[in-house]
């Protein structure tokens, strides 16, 4: 069975995602479409607006199999996000990775990916990082290509292509041009497509604009967001005030000395937004700071990080997805494709289980990794 993989967050699922999934199936000429989806926390450095089980149900309107991207991928830089996603795709024997981009020129993006792998080995690259320059800015300077590197989906696509060259050279790639609104557009201003940011804002504000840009057949699944990033503040504050500096230093993604700034600025902040503003510097992007704060919230330490894939958590599937899962189990009997988390399998997903517990504290949800059945359609 030939498969195409989509690396996703679906926060929430919308017409742009449906467009991407539909064209990916058509252009890849594959039998099965697989979504590797972030769980309850997403790459922006915040909790997803709906828990992963609801988002899985949404996704199955367009794909055949949904698996969870390991938490470490979701709360990392684009390169680590891509590395873990591609390794997960390899574990699932995916043939083609399809991603959206502003460029839609696979040749240009692959050329930049190859350039970057070489540039990152140079002493100049590491020196610029030490100077506090952001990763996209350094790459823009080194490659002399501002246009492609100004677009977030291009940058992420390049990270996928780098990871494929390094970890899965047999895998093919396909890119599909994004349609409609810009990635971080805050207002729904298109009759069919909109950014995730604008849809989340519409849902939060209880207006109905989101209905124009979400597939009709799944609109009944949408409701006011389960939680927002602001809900995390009391828990983050507790962690920063009660944890010793040495413990904070061990938190995943914290760079040398940033724990000092965290413990200073928490006493000057009365909300997540104000903490973010107080922590802001030229050296660190807002997204980096938010991911650090989520790792503080979840107490994810450097010792918790494992970039190898030892098992995959299956969240949901269609009949076609079920057939593909049977194919995987028959062809890779030593791999672990987990559809039911229990005492025997929980050790594979310690970070994800903890993230679900914390998400439930934030959102007053009750669906855990142990009591929620596989989503089937």
From Swiss-Prot:
Subcellular location: Cytoplasm
Keyword Ribosomal protein: no
Residues noted as binding ATP in the record, renumbered to the chain: 7-20, 100, 153, 178
GO biological process, any: tRNA modification
Coiled coil: none
Zinc listed as a keyword: no
Disulfide bonds: none
E.C. code: 6.3.4.-
One GO MF term: ATP binding
Catalytic activity: cytidine(34) in elongator tRNA(Met) + acetate + ATP = N(4)-acetylcytidine(34) in elongator tRNA(Met) + AMP + diphosphate
Keyword vocabulary terms for this entry: ATP-binding, Cytoplasm, Ligase, Nucleotide-binding, RNA-binding, tRNA processing, tRNA-binding
InterPro entries xref list: Rossmann-like_a/b/a_fold (IPR014729), tRNA(Met)_cyd_acetate_ligase (IPR008513)
Pfam entry (one): HIGH_NTase1
A GO cellular-component term linked to this record: cytoplasm
UniProt superkingdom: Bacteria
PANTHER family (UniProt xref): TRNA(MET) CYTIDINE ACETATE LIGASE
Family in the record: Belongs to the TmcAL family.
Chain's role: Catalyzes the formation of N(4)-acetylcytidine (ac(4)C) at the wobble position of elongator tRNA(Met), using acetate and ATP as substrates. First activates an acetate ion to form acetyladenylate (Ac-AMP) and then transfers the acetyl group to tRNA to form ac(4)C34.
Name of the protein in its database record: tRNA(Met) cytidine acetate ligase
Species of the source: Staphylococcus epidermidis (strain ATCC 35984 / DSM 28319 / BCRC 17069 / CCUG 31568 / BM 3577 / RP62A)
């Amino acid at each position: 069975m030939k498969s195409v993989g989509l690396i996703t967050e679906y926060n929430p699922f919308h017409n742009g995602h449906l467009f991407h999934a539909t064209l990916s199936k058509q252009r890849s000429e594959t039998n099965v479409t697989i979504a590797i989806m972030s769980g309850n926390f997403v790459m922006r450095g915040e909790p997803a607006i709906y828990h992963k089980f609801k988002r899985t149900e949404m996704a199955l309107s367009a794909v055949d199999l949904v698996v969870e991207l390991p938490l470490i991928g979701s709360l990392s830089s684009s390169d680590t996000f891509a590395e873990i996603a591609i390794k997960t795709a390899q574990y699932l024997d995916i043939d083609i990775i399809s991603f959206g981009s502003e460029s839609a020129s696979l040749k240009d993006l692959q050329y930049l990916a190859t350039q970057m792998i070489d540039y990152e080995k140079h002493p100049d690259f590491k020196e610029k990082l030490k100077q506090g320059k952001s990763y996209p800015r350094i790459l823009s300077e080194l490659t002399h290509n501002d246009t492609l590197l100004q677009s977030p989906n291009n940058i992420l696509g390049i990270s996928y292509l780098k990871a494929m060259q390094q970890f899965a050279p047999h895998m093919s790639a396909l890119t599909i041009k994004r349609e409609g609104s810009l990635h971080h557009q805050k207002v729904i201003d298109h009759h069919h497509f909109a950014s995730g940011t604008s849809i989340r804002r519409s849902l939060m504000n209880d207006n109905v604009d989101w209905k124009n840009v979400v597939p009709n057949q799944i609109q009944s699944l949408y409701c006011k967001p389960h939680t927002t990033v602001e809900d995390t503040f009391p828990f983050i504050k507790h962690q920063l005030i009660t944890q010793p500096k040495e413990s904070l230093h061990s938190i995943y993604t914290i760079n040398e000395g940033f724990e000092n700034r965290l413990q200073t600025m928490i006493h000057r902040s009365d909300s997540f937004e104000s903490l973010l503003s107080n922590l802001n510097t030229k050296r660190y992007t807002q997204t980096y700071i938010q991911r650090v704060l989520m790792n503080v919230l979840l107490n994810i330490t450097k010792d918790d990080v494992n970039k190898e894939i030892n098992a995959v958590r299956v969240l949901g599937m269609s009949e076609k997805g079920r057939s593909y899962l049977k194919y995987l189990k028959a062809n890779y009997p030593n791999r672990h494709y987990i559809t039911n988390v229990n005492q025997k399998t929980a050790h594979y997903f310690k970070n994800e289980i903890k993230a679900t517990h914390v998400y439930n504290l934030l959102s007053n949800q009750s669906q855990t990794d142990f009591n929620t059945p596989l989503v089937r359609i």
